[in-house]
């Protein structure tokens, strides 16, 4: 979208880390805030994570496997980043992070809270994608830990992103009319839950989620909704959307939504930007 954007993360200082940095630079993103960590050459001290994805076809769904063990970012601590410099001197206007990072380790929980609190100190807008992954939280305390951490984080969030499972597992809200396995979203119940969440967390300026109905691995129906100022706006429906690669669709939605909110302050337009960007 042409915005000045940087990434706050940590990489193992080796050839793989430099390759990752190169990919980020190709996207026009500033890498000067990356924390480079020394490594021993075989990953015992720290390493860079890997992701494997089977794209799927027809009735065979996409399957992802993330290898996050012992990664540099999971070992990063609050003192590894100068948040006063980032949000104070540099004047970053928006911070986006999420539950996958928070769940990486005990240190990650502390670091994301430190970042968010520093951002709020300097008036930076904070968005957070709950992105509940039970397998990740299981190693550091399970759903109880997920709720403890995310309920604290939620106090500082301006724009919260999450689906029905995210709000149920991470923040303890219930959606009326949903089945126990959350296989199908009761949209009316979800809208009611959003209003309850906004009452619990009056700091929420917007709450959003994508709407996806999987037809096959390569054909989905796609849309999104966004709550703001007591109203709920629904994006255009993308029926029968053909998909080459679904990985990152939610992140693309978030970036489009953020761009729309930053540049127009119009939630209806922003959720349409998000849905269109996610579709692309």
Regions found by a protein language model. Give the residues of each.
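A short helix->loop->beta-strand "cap" motif at the edges of active sites that frequently abuts
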Residues: 120-125, 201-205
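Alpha-helix C-terminal capping segments
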Residues: 1-5, 26, 260-264
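Conserved post-catalytic alpha-helical subdomain immediately downstream of the catalytic base
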Residues: 217, 233-280
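Conserved phosphate/ATP/ADP-binding segment of small-molecule kinases
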Residues: 133-231
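Anion (oxyanion) recognition and catalysis
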Residues: 25, 113, 117-121, 154
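Charged helix-capping and loop-helix junction motifs
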Residues: 80-81, 109-114, 141-151
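Hydrophobic beta-strand scaffold residues
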Residues: 5, 31, 126-128, 161
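Conserved N-terminal subdomain of the carbohydrate kinase-like
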Residues: 4-99
